[in-house]
Amino acid sequence: MAQDIISTIGDLVKWIIDTVNKFTKK
């Protein structure tokens, strides 16, 4: 259960970082 939550948060963090990188590169 905790493992699923951690992996979900990890995916969310990766997505946020990717999105921020796209905006900051412009």
UniProtKB/Swiss-Prot annotation:
PTM-bearing positions, type N-formylmethionine: M1
Consequence the record notes for mutating T24I: In strain: canine
Effect of W15L: In strain: canine
One Pfam match: Delta_lysin
Result, substituting N21E: In strain: canine
Gene Ontology terms: cellular component: extracellular region; host cell plasma membrane; membrane
Localisation per UniProt entry: Secreted; Host cell membrane
Keywords assigned: Cytolysis, Formylation, Hemolysis, Host cell membrane, Host membrane, Membrane, Secreted, Toxin, Transmembrane, Virulence
GO biological process: symbiont-mediated hemolysis of host erythrocyte
GO MF entry, a single one: toxin activity
Superkingdom of this protein's organism: Bacteria
Chief localisation class: secreted
Keyword set includes Cytoplasm: no
Role: Lyses erythrocytes and many other mammalian cells.
NCBIfam families on file: PRK14752.1-1, PRK14752.1-4
Similarity annotation: Belongs to the delta-lysin family.
Name of the protein described by the UniProt record: Delta-hemolysin
Natural source organism: Staphylococcus aureus
